[in-house]
């Protein structure tokens, strides 16, 4: 029994270190400290909540992230909440940049579809590309902002 506890001790210590690193990452994210996030990220690799650390790190520097970095994150954490949240953030940035090709390519993979601003960008793309009349939907989304 004592041997089992002794063997498990390093695993518990590693888990505790990962927990501490994640808490530090959460604080760094709230402060906007992207350098600290990047420094802490290797310490959470393999942790059950690694996706959160990776999300915070990439989200903090999203405006300078490359499309390749985005794709690597989206592939590595496919199917997770963090994957779709970062996709939401990326779609917003692509819309702000008026990167309609990138936006249109990524939009079908967006599962939650819970962001009104992303929906407005999607309607703009739809209108420009097909000439569809989207005025009623845009108006509905515009007025819904007051209720949010």
Where are the regions that the model predicts?
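Sec-dependent N-terminal signal peptides
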Residues: 1-6
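N-terminal signal peptide c-region/cleavage motif recognized by signal peptidases
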Residues: 8-10
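Alpha-helical solenoid repeat scaffolds
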Residues: 12-148
